[in-house]
Amino acid sequence: SGRMGVEGFCVENMTTTSGTKVVYTGVPGAYAEAAMDAYFGSEIDGFNVETFGDAMEAVHSGKAEYGVLPIENSSTGSVNDVYDLLSAYDNHIVGETMIKIEHALLGLPGSRLEDIHTVYSHPQGLMQCSRFLDGHREWQQVSLQNTAASAKRVLDDGDMAQAAIASKQAARNFGLTVLKERLNDLDNNFTRFVIISHKKIFQENADKISVCFEVPHESGTLYNILGHFIFNGLSMTRIESRPIQGKPWQYRFFVDFNGNLREQAVRNALHGIQSETEGFRILGNYKGVEPLY
């Protein structure tokens, strides 16, 4: 039912088959794979790439129909690289999902906590377990691309003095032993992942919209722009700013708010914002998930 929404978006329900290609970052056992499984189930053809940029490129070029990328963590905040990629690529957010992050310390079978002197993880993994790591100041902390790659590194190196901070699923995938569970500083640590597509589609029941825009550097500008949400009775759920490369002191804003592209209030607000900003883009309209606490 290709009914038009706004800005060339049209209503189309997402259908997947066992042949639908979905890309995620990291190696099997990464939280992104868990997010993909949670959103799509097993009836797809998932594959992994190394970086967020590679995933965006795969979706843009058509190698993958959908991509799964982390956008925000409940304890350590935004995944800045992904915000930058959303503005750089002509891809769209078509869904989101939330994954509970439960970090464990993984070592080789037979290794013991007291033998460890090097620990690998993603920088966010190290940050989210800082309280635990503070108790082991003598350990060398090494940042790698993602948590699952860290687990793989421990397996490949075969060194009893090395450990990784990753999921228990990664321990199963790589045949490692869980030396200690529940390392996170916070019990309720979640990462929100967005589902990306090159197609400009939104589902009939979509209730969350993401936009980005650049604001000319004048006082009061952002205030005026945000006024469009308020006047039209729309509630913002998130606002992020990122510096714009090559434009000192200028920022690109990312705003999430509740609504559907077919609603008049939404169209009014977007029209107003577009007229007062540069580089305005609707990143997507999708079904939001409730935060898990």
Which positions does each model-derived feature cover?
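Domain-level signature for soluble enzymes in the chorismate/prephenate branch of the shikimate pathway
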Residues: 1-293
